[in-house]
Amino acid sequence: MPRFVDRVVIHTWAGSGGNGCASIHRSKFKPLGGPDGGNGGRGGSVVFVVDPHVHTLLDFHFRPHITAPSGKQGMGNNRDGAAGADLEVKVPDGTVVLDEDGRLLADLVGAGTRFQAAAGGRGGLGNAALASRTRKVPGFALLGEQGESRDLTLELKSVADVGLIGFPSAGKSSLVSVISAAKPKIADYPFTTLVPNLGVVSVGEHAFTVADVPGLIPGASAGRGLGLDFLRHIERCAVLVHVVDCTSVEPGRDPILDIAALEAELAAYTPTLQGDTTLGDFAERPRAVVLNKIDVPDARELAEFVCDNIAAERGWPVFSVSTVTRENLQSLIFGLWQMISAYHAARSEPAPGRSLIRPVPVDDSGFTVEPDGQGGFVVTGTRPERWIHQTNFDNAEAVGYLADRLARLGVEDELLRVGAQPGCTVSIGGMTFDWEPQKPAGHPVAMSGRGTDARLESTDPVGTAERKVARHQRHKHGG
């Protein structure tokens, strides 16, 4: 069973809104008190919340389907339905949210950072909210909207100050184990490290974090080996450290060539977070080189030979260390701390508690009418499609109200303009019907006054004598 998961695809469904209620107020001496149907409750949203106690996406690996509760239906006596509670989903610090096309939606960094992954549907209006001067007693209510449904990709990118990069078996895990309290798996075969390991390094009263990630090989930027699984974990690192094995006897391998090969892979990799100004350009992050395993005599000679060449060619600090004898480890720790401090001092500190969130633009102001190629037309637009989903097509009044709304929006005028003929098929939001125009093009829309009741129109007071006659008639018919 996997213990560390850093990339998952999840399916989120927000709760649907509750339906509105169509009811008439009735009480003693007031049998027709007007509409009093309440509105439906809003559906619950799916919200990601950063929890510092969560360190992996393992839970989503086994439970990728996330559904928020729906809102309740409205009731009579102007009682609104209860809203569905938002479903808060805990994610690790450093989680990146991508849409189906791989576009970055949110970069969640910092405890308590929130992101609404799927919005709950709006509740339908009750007939009390739909009443107007021309529609005094609506005999219908609106249906609740469906909650948003989205397929998202979550990627966990380690939040560390220093990222150790190097070929497999270069000694990265050993280095982390001796400069911090971390205990990664250490062995003498390639790809011993299959998941990132984080260690905290103390520097006097200060501390910084180091990420030990799987080994890198040529072609990693194209996905070879552990490839992209490795590279995304160094995107947030302030300092990148090349860990070079000075004991390697493989043909075509030496410290200078190893560094060049690793830099070629980094140059070919395009970070997801490259637009985040708080991190800076990935290619310009400060680098350092650690020449490891100098406790071996031949390795020490090689390190002394290439040290000045690397510093002169690259301009990076070079540290020759041994994790066995712990030689020069303190110099390495203080050198890395100075590089981290200089990096952060040169950059403006981001506001606390903020995250990179890129909302998807939504245009709900207009609509389009296009022929469907079979003599009919398709109307697309946020508002017309939403109105279709709010309509109960078993209720003639509700259908008439929909026709009024579409006419006010200009859908009917546009259909006439593009040549739609009475009786042709029109599709809106998955609903297809035969279109019949309500008015000539260009004429103002006359509201139909649907839902009126003549008994509510009278404003003349009823006299005592008339009430006595009415009561006598009721008693007479009653027996």
Swiss-Prot record:
Q: Which cofactor does it need?
A: Mg(2+)
* Domain OBG-type G intervals: 160-341
For the region Disordered, give the residue spans: 438-479
Instruction: Give start-end positions of Basic residues composition bias.
Output: 469-479
> Known Pfam families for this protein?
DUF1967 (PF09269), GTP1_OBG (PF01018), MMR_HSR1 (PF01926)
Q: Which residues form the OCT domain?
A: 359-437
- Residues that, per the record, bind GTP: 166-173, 191-195, 212-215, 292-295, 322-324
- Oligomer status and interactors: Monomer.
In its UniProt entry, what is this protein called? GTPase Obg
